[in-house]
Structure formats: C-alpha cells, structure tokens
C-alpha cells in the first residue's frame, strides 16, 4: 500500500495544478447512469488516481486494494476514479449495469466509476490520450 501511495505521489508531482485542471475539465457519465460529471469541478483540489479497470482479468482483485486505498485516504483528499475498458483481450465484455453490479457485490466498490471507455492508443478516449502525453 505504501509503495502504491508513493507511486501516486510521484506521478502527481509531474502535473502542475494548471495541467491537472485542464486535463480534468472533461465530462463523463457515471457508470450505468445518466448523471454527467465534470471531473474538474467535482474533484477540484483532490489527488486523483485514474484507473482503467476490467472485471475478467488477472488484475481484477486489485478492485479490493483500490477500494481500501480510497477508503483509507479519502478524508485526506484522495479520490480513485475507475473507467472500465474492454480494450485488452475482451476482459470487460459486460454491460455497464453488469460491471456496476459485479464491482459492488464482489468488491464492495464505492469509489466513483464512470462510463466504459477505450484507453488503447489509436482509439483512446481524449482523456486517456492526454494522460499518456
């Protein structure tokens, strides 16, 4: 856990607050919902960890660690944002409703989850292209 937090801190230092504000000024729909959230407005002043997720891969158990990290540091200003993606060997094939149910029932995920997106270079959502730049 300490290593993950250290890596997060190191990554966060590579962005200035102006870069982060520009990057986060994007709208995403909540997973399996209609509510649209502007990340910049909703998470201004927070340390933001963005993760692409999949429910049927070897790393799926990381939901548990991500939720623990979120619960432990939420009051200190950390937010974990999950973005399901089916880009890697079809490991997130379900509907958004199925993904949401799986995350809640299997790992008690409470950190914010957003619409299913493409994260792979070439087809990536603009947000992920900007993260990779």
Regions found by a protein language model. Give the residues of each.
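Positively charged n-region of N-terminal signal peptides that target proteins for export
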Residues: 1-4
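Bacterial N-terminal signal peptides
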Residues: 6-14
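Sec/Tat signal peptide C-region and signal peptidase I cleavage site
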Residues: 15-20
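Terminal helix/beta-alpha structural elements that buttress the NAD(P)+-binding lobe
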Residues: 25-27, 115, 129
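A short beta-strand-turn-helix
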Residues: 26-47, 68-73
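Conserved hydrophobic packing residues within short motifs/helices of P-loop NTPase cores
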Residues: 48-51, 81
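Amphipathic alpha-helical repeat scaffolds
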Residues: 52-56
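Structural microenvironment flanking redox-active thiols in thiol-disulfide oxidoreductases
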Residues: 59-126
């Amino acid at each position: 856990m300490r290593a993950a937090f250290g890596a997060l801190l190191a990554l966060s230092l590579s962005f200035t607050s102006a870069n982060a504000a520009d990057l986060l000024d994007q709208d995403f729909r909540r997973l399996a919902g209609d509510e649209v959230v502007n990340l910049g407005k909703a998470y201004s002043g927070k340390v933001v960890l963005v993760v692409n997720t999949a429910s049927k891969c070897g790393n799926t158990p990381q939901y548990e660690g991500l939720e623990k990290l979120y619960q432990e540091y939420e009051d200190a200003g950390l937010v974990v944002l999950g973005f399901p993606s089916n880009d890697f060997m079809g490991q997130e094939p379900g509907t958004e409703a199925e993904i949401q149910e799986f995350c809640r029932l299997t790992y008690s995920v409470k950190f914010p989850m957003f619409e299913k997106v493409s994260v792979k270079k070439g087809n990536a959502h603009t947000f992920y292209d900007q993260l990779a730049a």
